[in-house]
UniProtKB/Swiss-Prot annotation:
Keyword annotations of the record: Aromatic hydrocarbons catabolism, Isomerase
Family to which the UniProt record says this protein belongs: Belongs to the muconolactone Delta-isomerase family.
Pathway(s) this gene product operates in, as recorded in its UniProt entry: Aromatic compound metabolism; beta-ketoadipate pathway; 5-oxo-4,5-dihydro-2-furylacetate from catechol: step 3/3
Taxonomy, superkingdom: Bacteria
Name this polypeptide is given: Muconolactone Delta-isomerase
InterPro entries: Dimeric_a/b-barrel, MLI_dom, Muconolactone_d_Isoase
Subunit structure, interactors included: Homodecamer.
Gene Ontology BP term (one): beta-ketoadipate pathway
Keyword hit for Lipid metabolism: no
Reactions mediated catalytically: (S)-muconolactone = (4,5-dihydro-5-oxofuran-2-yl)-acetate
Record GO terms (molecular function): muconolactone delta-isomerase activity
UniProt keyword annotation of Chaperone present: no
């Protein structure tokens, strides 16, 4: 199942830099692991924002929820999920 996911990150302004750096490093490692597994298929930065659009390919809504809630930045994110279906005019 394919999903388009927008993630907006809002770290607290008073979060110590070392804590923020640790969370970001763990986030990067987890995101890259999911990409290597083929579950996080595409990742795009939103220009000028601390946000991204991503394409996930997972087996169920529950699996996606588990993956997203496992992100170290999850407590600081606003997430919008859009399930995708193949378009009848697509040649792919």
């Amino acid at each position: 199942m394919l999903y388009l996911v927008r993630m907006d990150v809002n770290l607290p302004h008073d979060m110590p830099a070392a804590q923020a750096d640790d969370i970001k490093a763990r986030e990067k490692a987890y995101a890259q692991q999911l990409q290597h597994e083929g579950k996080w298929q595409q990742l795009y930065r939103v220009v000028g924002e601390y946000a991204n659009y991503s394409i996930f390919d997972v087996g169920s809504h529950d699996e996606l929820h588990t993956l997203l809630s496992g992100l170290p930045l999850f407590p600081y994110m606003k997430i919008h999920v859009t399930p995708l279906a193949k378009h009848p005019s697509s040649i792919r």
